UniProtKB/Swiss-Prot annotation:
InterPro entries: AAA+_ATPase (IPR003593), ATPase_AAA_core (IPR003959), Clp_ATPase_C (IPR019489), ClpA/B (IPR001270), ClpA/B_CS1 (IPR018368), ClpA/B_CS2 (IPR028299), ClpA/ClpB_AAA_lid (IPR041546), ClpA_ClpB (IPR050130)
GO cellular component: cytoplasm
Organism of this sequence: Mycoplasmoides gallisepticum (strain R(low / passage 15 / clone 2))
Chain residues that bind ATP 2: 465-472
Origin superkingdom: Bacteria
Domain notes: The N-terminal domain probably functions as a substrate-discriminating domain, recruiting aggregated proteins to the ClpB hexamer and/or stabilizing bound proteins. The NBD2 domain is responsible for oligomerization, whereas the NBD1 domain stabilizes the hexamer probably in an ATP-dependent manner. The movement of the coiled-coil domain is essential for ClpB ability to rescue proteins from an aggregated state, probably by pulling apart large aggregated proteins, which are bound between the coiled-coils motifs of adjacent ClpB subunits in the functional hexamer.
UniProt-annotated stretches for the region NBD2: 415-617
Protein name, per record: Chaperone protein ClpB
Subcellular location: Cytoplasm
GO molecular function, one term: ATP hydrolysis activity
Subunit structure: Homohexamer. The oligomerization is ATP-dependent.
Binding site for ATP 1: 59-66
PROSITE patterns: CLPAB_1, CLPAB_2
Gene this chain is encoded by: clpB
């Protein structure tokens, strides 16, 4: 005889696949929601409706959609809701847990139906919150070979009002998934969540500051919060407030917390010095034991003295560091007690135990706050502050500089000097174009001082001039002076964009075309390096329609790529070069140059450029300076082979005389030096006629038309 077997129904299935927001708020495990009162009120209104009482929060990632639901749950816990929503529990459904292990047909539907049945049986006392609600569309259909997806199981119960659901998703995903399912869209009521303003974001962060301070055990100054909002809004364009500003504070606090628990830099430096000196001492003492004749006994004694001094300094700083750390840990313990007491006061007041709450509020908390002030004063009395315990604007600037590679941190003396000397440094490389150098270096200074227009590039320039006068070289050397690397420049050769459709190379192919999944050359380069010199070389060679893409870059400092992502050009220097009107520049006729420029470049583009700079033709003095620079570079290259060669004035005069060409600028000089001087020196090096570690002077004999190398002892011809 076979008995029929009925499996026991699983109880509390809802708690297995979800988390109760009310419980977590009661345990003070969720940060409070600051502001967003209008959205929370709208949420309550929709949930109080008879029909279409399933709100869905729609907004960009990071604007605070989940925080609004948590704020609503907090109002329920505090009893600040209408009677129909009192004692209601907000339960967040975990979709990943729900679908895990449902590989057999029907298992997913069974599990979801059990959850929905439990919600239904609660008689409206449970509200389901589903984050990323667009995932319901299609969920369960593929993984468990089901005939229905999660959305189709939910829809009938939502239509009958048997369950209430709060959803949250982004604008793109709502459009892509939910709008396509008309029945699901009709059952939900949209609440648009906009990005908060800077002031609203700052209010949110000020409200959360105590929680961050308690968690990271560091002090966060108000100027750090202001800087986080302002700098994130200006320099991080692909994310949204308040999330991006909160991330900056969190990152800076984590950085300081890590430093607190690590050896201070002062102690670490001394430790490294002791290691280096001890290593050198050990090597010298070993040589002394082996009776080497060249052992420096004086150096051994000096090393012993230095090691002793550094060890004493290390011991002194270690004692101070230990004392400061002990006081700091005591302060943190007291602050933690204050936080716990504050939470206990709220709990007691909610229960109506006001006597006990008053005792904690007016007796216990002031006692601990007095102790905190005493310990803080004790910590501030140390002359050597080895523990950094606070975050200011400087730390926020360091974090954002590290993340975006945009130099915002406080100027150190070396960098300050480099910026002030930028004009002189550029003049060393570029000869005869002082006007161009001044304008470009001034633009960099404005940008670094952060007084330029924040909604446009740091500077935009159009360099006009004949070939070979230094237009491209200015951009290269500017990148070198700013980043110590010419490759930091983003160079776009506009001769590659002669067809109308070649604009796709810059921002990527549009949807449906081959290469849509590949990024554009320009957009990808700036997303990777937002602080860069961007050179559009020879713009007259590109198709006129391709240049239209520059309009929004120059005007708004941003560009939308093929994936509809904003690319931020507000921290770039835009340089365009052109040979338009070169013959008029050589003829010293600026009016005709501008006339030809207006014929070939559209006025709306010219009107957006900050400065139109005309590079003049090079005269003999300029060419002589360039020849000296080229020969100096050649001398530096030869020095790598331990051969010192200098070039006299006769060589320079000969190079300028035979190698210059007004039409072609400085490039013929380079070719002449390569053809005549470099070939001569190469033969001498291959023939081993030049000795290493010797100095030579290279000269030119005009009568014999020969080059000669002269040293102190003999001539090599």
């Amino acid at each position: 005889m076979f008995a029929s077997f009925t499996p026991t129904e699983e109880k509390n299935v809802l708690s297995k696949y979800s988390r109760n927001l009310n419980d977590e708020i009661a345990r003070n495990a969720i940060d409070p929601t600051i502001g967003r009162e209008e959205e929370i009120r709208r949420l309550i209104e929709i949930l109080s409706r008879k029909n279409k009482n399933n709100p869905v929060l729609i907004g960009e990632p990071g604007v605070g959609k989940t925080a609004i639901v948590e704020g609503f749950a907090r109002k329920i816990v505090n009893g600040d809701v209408p009677d129909n929503l009192k004692d209601v529990e907000v339960v967040e459904l975990s979709l990943s847990s729900l679908i895990a292990g449902t590989q057999f047909q029907g298992s997913f539907e069974e599990r979801l139906n059990k959850i929905l049945k439990e919600v239904k049986n609660s008689s409206g006392k449970v509200i389901l919150f589903i984050d990323e609600i667009h995932q319901l569309v299609g969920m369960g259909k593929n993984s468990s070979n089901s005939a229905m997806d999660a959305a189709n199981i939910l829809k009938p119960m939502m239509a009958r009002g048997e369950i209430k659901v709060i959803g949250a998703t982004t604008i793109d995903e709502y459009r892509k998934y939910i709008e396509k399912d008309g029945a699901l869209e009709r059952r939900m009521q949209k609440i648009l969540v906009d990005e908060p303003t800077k002031q609203e974001a700052l209010t949110i962060m000020r409200g959360l500051r105590e929680r961050w301070e308690a968690f990271h055990k560091v002090r966060i100054f108000d100027d750090a919060l202001v800087a986080a909002v302002e700098m994130s809004a200006r320099y991080i364009s692909d994310r949204y407030l308040p999330d991006k500003a909160i991330d900056l504070i969190d990152e800076a606090a984590a950085k300081i917390k890590t430093l607190i628990h690590s050896l201070p830099p002062e102690l670490d430096n001394i430790k490294q010095k002791i290691i280096h000196l001890s290593t050198e001492l050990a090597a010298l003492e070993r040589e002394k034991k082996e009776n080497h004749s060249n052992v420096r006994l004086g150096r051994i004694e000096q090393l012993k003295k230095e090691i002793k001094d550094f060890t004493n300094k290390q011991n002194e700083l270690t004692v101070k560091w230990t004392q400061q750390k002990t006081i700091y840990e005591c302060i943190n313990k007291l602050k933690e007690e204050v936080t716990n007491l504050t939470a206990e006061i709220e709990r007691l007041q909610a229960k109506g135990e006001y006597t006990q709450a008053s005792k904690l509020l007016y007796l216990e908390i002031p006692k601990r706050q007095e102790e905190i002030e005493k310990k803080t004063k004790e910590l501030s009395e140390f002359t050597d502050n080895l523990i950094k315990t606070s975050i200011s604007r400087v730390e926020i600037a360091e974090v954002i500089s590290q993340a975006t590679k945009i130099p915002l941190s406080k100027l150190v003396a070396s960098e300050q000097q480099k910026l002030l000397n930028l004009k002189n440094d550029l003049s060393k490389y570029i000869k005869g174009q002082d006007h161009a150098i001044k304008n470009v270096s001034d633009a960099v200074l404005r940008g670094r001082a952060q007084i330029n227009d924040p909604n446009r590039p740091i500077g935009s320039f159009l360099f006009l001039g004949p070939t070979g006068v230094g237009k491209t070289e200015v951009a290269k050397k500017l990148a070198y002076c700013l980043f110590d690397n010419e490759k930091a420049m983003v160079r776009i050769d506009m001769s590659e964009f002669m067809e109308r459709h070649s604009v796709d190379k810059l921002i990527g192919s549009p949807p449906g075309y081959i290469g849509y999944d590949q990024p554009g050359v320009l957009s990808d380069a700036i997303r990777t390096k937002p602080y860069a010199v961007v050179l559009f070389d020879e713009i007259e060679k590109a198709h006129p329609d391709v240049l239209n893409i520059l309009l929004q870059i120059l005007d708004d400092g941003q560009l939308t790529d093929n994936h509809n992502r904003l690319v931020n050009f507000k921290n770039t220097i835009i340089i365009m070069t052109s040979n338009i009107g070169a013959e008029h520049i050589l003829a010293n006729n600026p009016a005709k140059t501008i006339e030809e420029l207006k014929r070939k470049i559209r006025p709306e583009l010219l009107n957006r450029i900050d400065e139109l700079i005309t590079f003049k033709a090079l005269n003999d003095k300029d060419l002589s300076a360039i020849a000296q620079k080229l020969l100096s570079d050649l001398s530096d290259r030869i020095k790598k082979q331990q051969i010192n060669i200098t070039f006299d004035k006769k060589i320079v005069e000969n190079v300028v005389k035979h190698g210059s060409n007004t039409v072609f600028g400085a490039r013929p000089l380079k070719r002449y030096i390569q053809r005549e001087v470099e070939n001569f020196l190469a033969k001498k090096i291959i023939e081993n006629k030049l000795e290493k570690n010797k100095s030579y002077v290279c000269t030119f004999n005009a009568e014999t038309n020969e080059y000669t190398l002269v040293n102190l002892r003999k001539a090599v011809s």
